[in-house]
Amino acid sequence: MAFRGFDAAKLSTLANDLDTLGRNSGTLHSRLAALLTTVQQNLPPGQSASRNPDLQDLVGDLVPMPFFGRRRLPGSLGGELGDMQASMKRRIKQLEGLQELERRGYPVSDGTLFLDEQPPDPKKIDDALRHLQELQGKDFGTNGNRDDLEKISGELDGLTAGELDALMTKASPKDLAFYNQLLTNTDDSLLNPFDENGLPEDRRRDTLSRMLAKISPENVPKFQAAFPGMQPTFTNTGAYEDGGNDQNGQSNNGIHWATPGDPLFKDGVSADDINQHQFGDCWYVASLAGLAQKDPKFVQDGIKQNPNGTVSVRVWDKDGNYQWVTMTADLPTDQNGNPISTYGNGESWPAYYEKAFALVYSDDGDGERGYGGIEGDDPKKSAPYLTGKEGDDLTTGGFLGLGEHDDKNIQSLKKAFDSGKVVTVSTPDDESLEKNHPPEWEPSYCTNHAYYVRGFTADGKIILGNPWGSSYPPITVSQDQFDKYFQGPEAFDVP
């Protein structure tokens, strides 16, 4: 009997047939190759056993070699069909487990059907749900609640997508909200200043990211309501408070959350994909663009879209801990549906890198978090979050740290760039430079702004890219111009 469009019995028959075909493909390969080889041996020189090049390749290939050389049909079907039928059988068992789960009265969302995971275990769901509910009114003792929360996080991390989604559906909004309240409150109690409460931010975010990546789309709004800290605020940004970015002239009449229609990638990753738009985080976006230029594959491998539509980005936190940060797909958007945050040319991957950074970054000098917390800072501070490696000032002179100053020698920057490093520079906050820079740099030069190094000319000039995007052409700068109009060269290694 079909279950929401899936007929487990018919799928099992198909999987068994594929298994049989896969196991017989080697025999078919050898017989076909033997026939073609015999034909070839009985033909005059210069003639082929077959006009089909794929069949002609089988001449002499009597034994299919699955591990060495080029794999040819039909012998190569053994591995491919074997993998396919094994995956189908695992998914069928999961589907049958969901059917049984529903018969027992558990909620089952369509988004969890036919996943490649273990069948759901009702006891694991019941245990995790009971422990979640028991947090209400529980006496956590003198050592605080962290050990209890660690236990529940471990339980939640161990649930399959189907199990976790059933728990999310059955759990009350009140229980989920109280769990979030306990997770986020790390203060000591008044009676015992040495107890441990809540979970550290990285551990908390890791558990919630795993949950958000697994649950069905139907449960995402419920998750958002229970765990609002998994959405970075934009109400503390200049774009929200002032209606735009006064440096690049972009403006808006209001910001709201909306999901873009563009894919993560259209033509892979390129620095030219990146357009900073209205948030004032040029320091981060310049570093991201420089990294995309140096190692586009590293950037592309660091982001993925989950089956439920959420997006996960690879981020290191300020302590060097590596994790995948999961977020909903909606982005800050203006009244006309245009992106407010960093975006690409018909592709959305830069926006999610920025959103993940806004969730994680906690080093703002004013204590701000979210998008407002990543406005106006130092490019090298973004390096540990992007790569797990520290960024460095490029300096020269001095003794024992005294008297050092910016190394503005273009050849020094070229040496760092040629060694594989991402190199960024900044401009002073100087109104006179804003008014009196070389006209050929229009519209790309701006004071109090960050740039990334794109390359160097044969005659010793440096080429700088503006994170505002491809509408702002790279500028070519001589040594004298660099000394006057730029400062703060920094660099970081690419993994």
Locate the predicted segments by residue.
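N-terminal secretion-targeting helices of virulence/extracellular proteins
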Residues: 1-154, 162-169
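Non-catalytic all-alpha helical scaffold/repeat segments
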Residues: 105-234
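Acidic helix-start/capping segments at beta-turn-to-alpha-helix junctions
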Residues: 35-40, 304-315
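Surface-exposed patches in mature extracellular/periplasmic domains of secreted proteins
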Residues: 296-305
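Generic beta-strand structural signal
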Residues: 305-306, 456-458
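Predominantly the structural core of cysteine protease catalytic domains
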Residues: 229-250, 258-295, 310-456, 463-495
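Helix N-cap and loop-to-helix transition residues
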Residues: 7, 160, 172, 216, ...
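Generic detector of well-ordered alpha-helical segments enriched in charged/polar residues
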Residues: 33-36, 56, 60, 78, ...
